[in-house]
């Protein structure tokens, strides 16, 4: 009974505080590292946001440059096709041969003998030339029309795709809301990369197709 009464009973919710007689010390490397690192979580989040925006801008600039190059090549092909069509449709001037005065021209029209009618040359050569001329014109017009349709498809890429614009906006908004936890925006970043890859794949398909 005496032993039980000698220990004070701890009341519910009581706290024990232990104090150390020796001072707490940190290594010099840790102290130097903490003093030299002045960047806060907010500053790191802003740096990450700027880096992502720069990468997005570079990717869009690369797509626009590639599109401009393709448009220039198509316009060049259209110009060459038009020049070829004009050259093919232009009538060729007949060759004129000059002979000295008093010489005999074997290519001159023959004077029919008496009692024989003069038969003109068959128009087969003229018809073949006309058919070839028409075929060349149709093929050139068909190629020009095909290139024009492709060119109109390329011009649509000048405007930013809605999916890419939305994904970019979501990434920026997420980084602003989670400035101290930028890694929480991995879903938005992955979706943006997916939209950019889809846009680039469609661009390549339009060029190859």
From Swiss-Prot:
UniProt-annotated location(s): Mitochondrion inner membrane
Keyword Ribonucleoprotein: no
Residue ranges the record marks as coiled coil: 48-86, 127-156
Entry's Gene Ontology cellular component terms: mitochondrial inner membrane
Biological processes per GO annotation: cellular response to osmotic stress
Inducers of expression: Down-regulated when grown with elevated levels of potassium chloride.
Membrane topology of this protein: Peripheral membrane protein
InterPro entries assigned to the protein according to its UniProt record, in alphabetical order: DUF1690 (IPR012471)
Protein keywords: Coiled coil, Membrane, Mitochondrion, Mitochondrion inner membrane, Stress response
Subunit: Component of the mitochondrial contact site and cristae organizing system (MICOS) complex.
Family: Belongs to the MICOS complex subunit Mic19 family.
Role summary: Component of the MICOS complex, a large protein complex of the mitochondrial inner membrane that plays crucial roles in the maintenance of crista junctions, inner membrane architecture, and formation of contact sites to the outer membrane. Involved in osmoadaptation.
Protein name in UniProt: MICOS complex subunit mic19
């Amino acid at each position: 009974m005496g032993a039980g009464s000698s220990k004070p009973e701890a009341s519910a919710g009581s706290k024990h505080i232990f104090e150390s007689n020796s001072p707490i010390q940190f290594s010099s490397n840790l102290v130097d590292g903490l003093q030299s690192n002045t960047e806060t979580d907010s500053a790191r989040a802003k740096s990450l946001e700027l880096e992502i925006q720069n990468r997005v801008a570079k990717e869009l600039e690369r797509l626009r440059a590639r599109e401009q190059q393709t448009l220039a090549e198509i316009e060049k092909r259209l110009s060459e096709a038009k020049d070829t069509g004009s050259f093919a449709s232009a009538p060729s001037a007949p060759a004129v041969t000059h002979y000295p005065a008093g010489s005999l021209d074997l290519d001159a029209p023959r004077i029919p003998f008496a009692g024989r009618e003069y038969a003109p040359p068959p128009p087969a050569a003229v018809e073949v030339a006309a058919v070839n001329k028409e075929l060349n014109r149709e093929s050139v017009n068909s190629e020009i029309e095909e290139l024009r349709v492709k060119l109109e498809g390329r011009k649509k890429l000048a405007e930013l795709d809605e999916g890419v614009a939305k994904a970019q906006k979501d990434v920026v908004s997420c980084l602003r809301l989670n400035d101290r936890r930028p890694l929480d925006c991995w879903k938005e970043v992955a979706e943006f990369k997916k939209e950019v890859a889809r846009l680039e794949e469609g661009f390549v398909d339009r060029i190859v197709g």
